[in-house]
């Protein structure tokens, strides 16, 4: 994990964040994933202080590992990621737009935890998302 600096602070703030699709609908297919990565890339360009470390999905939820500076709340970062990706995916994929005529595509809430010394285990866990033969959690060192 890299130490970063602002004008008056130095920090290492990495988070593991998970959120699901609204109604747990399984639309995060392999062909949707490149578009999701592209829009998150645009979010990172718009907000260069956010650093996306890793990302992976299962059919109905998304895991990201991200660095967020202390002057930006986790809620604000998640709100940007969710709102921009929701609008883009609805525009790009008609089936998603018809699935969610009433608004956003993501569930209202999210899970977040800080990452410290277990960064490598979190990376492995995220990398294994969506795999059919995911090893037991204990084999990853949790």
What are the residue ranges of the model-derived segments?
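Basic nucleic-acid-binding interfaces
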Residues: 1-142
């Amino acid at each position: 994990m890299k130490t970063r600096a602002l004008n008056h602070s130095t920090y290492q703030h990495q988070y593991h964040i998970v959120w699901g699709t609204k109604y747990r609908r399984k639309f995060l297919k392999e062909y949707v994933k490149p578009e999701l990565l592209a829009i998150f890339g645009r979010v990172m360009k718009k907000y260069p202080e956010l650093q996306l470390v890793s990302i992976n999905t299962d059919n109905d939820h998304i895991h990201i590992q991200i660095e967020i500076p202390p002057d930006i709340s986790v809620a604000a970062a998640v709100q940007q990621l969710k709102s921009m990706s929701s609008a883009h995916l609805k525009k790009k994929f008609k089936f998603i737009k018809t699935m969610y005529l009433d608004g956003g595509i993501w569930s209202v809430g999210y899970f977040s935890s800080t990452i410290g010394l277990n960064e490598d285990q979190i990376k492995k866990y995220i990398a294994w998302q969506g795999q059919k033969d995911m090893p037991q959690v204990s084999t990853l060192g949790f």
